[in-house]
Amino acid sequence: VQHAATHIQAIGKAVPEHDVHLDYIRWAEEQMGQSRERALFTRMARRSGIDHRWSVLARDEASRSATSAEGFFRASPAPSTARRMEIYTREAPELALAAIADLARQAELGGITHLVVASCTGFVAPGIDQIIARRLGLSPAIERTLVGFMGCYAGIAALRVAHHIVRSDPQARVLVVAVELCSLHLPSGSGLDVLLGAMQFGDGAAATLVCAGPSGTRLDRFFCTTLPASDALIQWTIGDTGFDMILSGEVPARIAQALQEPELRDVLLAGQDAAMLDWAVHPGGRTIVDAVEGGLALDPAALGPSRSVLARFGNMSSATILFVLAEIMARPRHAAGIAMAFGPGLAAEGFAFSRA
């Protein structure tokens, strides 16, 4: 069966205006007092590879209300999950629409037939997909899909859904949106592992158009795999005071080990030479990027786009991979590439792409 080739036409991006990275580091240091853990946190913060993280929470407000970063950090008791979802319901659609507006400056968005939204940091019904469709004035009959709670590879899953839609219906024009408000889930605990984990994450949104047009970046094949006996390494659960992240320190070593195994390399590369590809790797953290580089024996420059996005935005969960892909599309080094993200499972999802 001959299927239509699918293409990404452009990628729109948006982050909130509040840079809270240094605020968070100061707050986290206060939680630990003058302890050995504080010294270790400070050292690891400096080595994180992150310079900025953006939040829908205001950086500094005299009122220190629950919607300001300072107020959210210092509130006692910590804001409830319900309170955090109120902010998600208000702010997530706005950030998504800003990314779509950026996309509209690069690509014609008329005739949208499908909407696929990835979001793992909040829940609301009617869903954020319906809110976005209504705010954009899309047809009430538009076909919608919401990809939720999959974590950092949800953006790839959303692209995979769009890819299969266009392959089955070459006339389809699929708007894909990934929007995450990770900063809403500031931890209530003060342990080193909890505070270091939260230090990675920021807010962001990205949008792209997937269709069968002859131009753009072609989506060639998708793949996914789950590493055995790894389900406890990354967990994302709903708590009473936000969503709780468990991120084991074993993750980088497991990734590096898996990437050296023939089974995963065959799934990932499908016979291609890793050195001759562009690499859009989700920067889950500096050690994750380093693990992929070492596991695949890549030149350090190969993961420059991933490190650049990590430094300027932190880990924005599902939206991050689209930020990295946008960097590669703007300055490609090779004719083809691989996009990949790791998340709960421990699973890897990705796709091969090439220039049309």
Predicted regions and their residues:
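Glycine/charged-rich beta-loop-alpha catalytic/anionic-binding loops adjacent to active sites
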Residues: P79-S80, G110-H114, L136-G148, S188-D193, ...
